[in-house]
Amino acid sequence: MEIGTPLFEGSKKILLLGSGELGKEMAIEAQRMGLEVVALDRYDLAPAMHVAHRKYVVDMMNPNAIKAVVKRERPDAIIAEIEAINTDALIELESNGFRVVPNANAVKACMNRIELRRFAAEKLKLPTTKYAFAENEEEVKRACKDIGFPCLIKPEMSSSGHGHVLVNKIENVEEAYRESISHARGKSRRVIVEEFVKIDTELTVLTYRYHSNSDSIITKTIEPIEHKRPSYYYVESWHPSNVSQGVKETARGIAQKVAEELGGLGIYGVEIIVSGNRILFSEVAPRPHDTGLVTLASSDINEFQIHVRSAIGLPTPEVKLVSPAASHVILAQTENVWGPKFLNIEKAMEIPGVQVRLFGKPVTYEKRRMGVVLATGNSVEEALEKVRKASSIILVK
């Protein structure tokens, strides 16, 4: 493979659809590889725009906007970083010869909970929670009765964790349904009603596909990451997981099956729920995963580098754990503060093995993820203790 110089003829170029913290890390890895980076998002000054060669502020639900930028830039790889993308535009672009990573149909399937559940439970026959689909209040009531209380209502499409509503009794169903769809992407009123299970722990199995030297596509999994989401969104993760080897092998088998069926190139973040003796498929992201931020500290090759390498046709034959590690988010507690400031960074960094990554988001809202603390240790328990302490010290003002 030949890689040219950025901003010159013959450069290799990636186009990021979404410029959040995951996109920023991909952009940094791409810059290190000598690639040209173009970043898109719906708002200006998004994190990946800080480290891109060019940026565009567009509505990515508008197919004409996406196609216009792609036609102008003609990237070697189009990488979807967020959920709010017009996937029909990606399918059209792919049919016209552009490489969409991992592939356009996978992006479309993974961003729709209903289609994803059909794919996993009905096509692949993977173990999942009990579920039903509904698109109005009466159907939701019937679904909740069939599934049993307590149960969860989730929008067909939403960003991670948003719109997940726990329902304990029939009297609360209508309000819960309205709350859930208020977080939906687009105009869909469809939801998935799921059995509520006691979660002992959750795993993310990072599974990636790349071109080998023989041009065949190889699928590999990384040692599972463990995490817990107290309010349906990522707070902390640690690597490696503490679950048994048998649970890890089952989880990796599920993830491998999902990635091979979805196909394409790049990394998938496959989410697994462990509930008693049940090991259940939950969701899959067609990109680096937020819980995988821990690989910036734990692994010799992090998830972002893997994804970019695969996107442009480079191999990643092996990923090694170099240290037990943990990550913990830094959340904003303020609303609508532009140009926020971070206090006590020096105190957090006094803890040995701690790194602080600030994402550079231009404005806060309550519980917005503004940064992450990473730490290594002799064990994941030691690393977790460090990141919890360090993240509690840092204030967003």
Curated annotation (Swiss-Prot):
N(1)-(5-phospho-beta-D-ribosyl)glycinamide binds at residues 21-22, 81, 290, 361, 368-369. It catalyses: N(1)-(5-phospho-beta-D-ribosyl)glycinamide + formate + ATP = N(2)-formyl-N(1)-(5-phospho-beta-D-ribosyl)glycinamide + ADP + phosphate + H(+). Keywords: ATP-binding, Ligase, Magnesium, Metal-binding, Nucleotide-binding, Purine biosynthesis. GO terms for cellular component: cytosol. Pathway: Purine metabolism; IMP biosynthesis via de novo pathway; N(2)-formyl-N(1)-(5-phospho-D-ribosyl)glycinamide from N(1)-(5-phospho-D-ribosyl)glycinamide (formate route): step 1/1. Mg(2+) binds at residues 271, 283. The keyword Magnesium applies. ATP binds at residues 113, 154, 194-197, 202. InterPro entries: ATP-grasp, ATP-grasp_carboxylate-amine, ATP_grasp_subdomain_1, PreATP-grasp_dom_sf, PurT, PurT/PurK_preATP-grasp, PurT_C. GO terms for biological process: 'de novo' IMP biosynthetic process. The keyword Ribonucleoprotein does not apply. This is Formate-dependent phosphoribosylglycinamide formyltransferase.
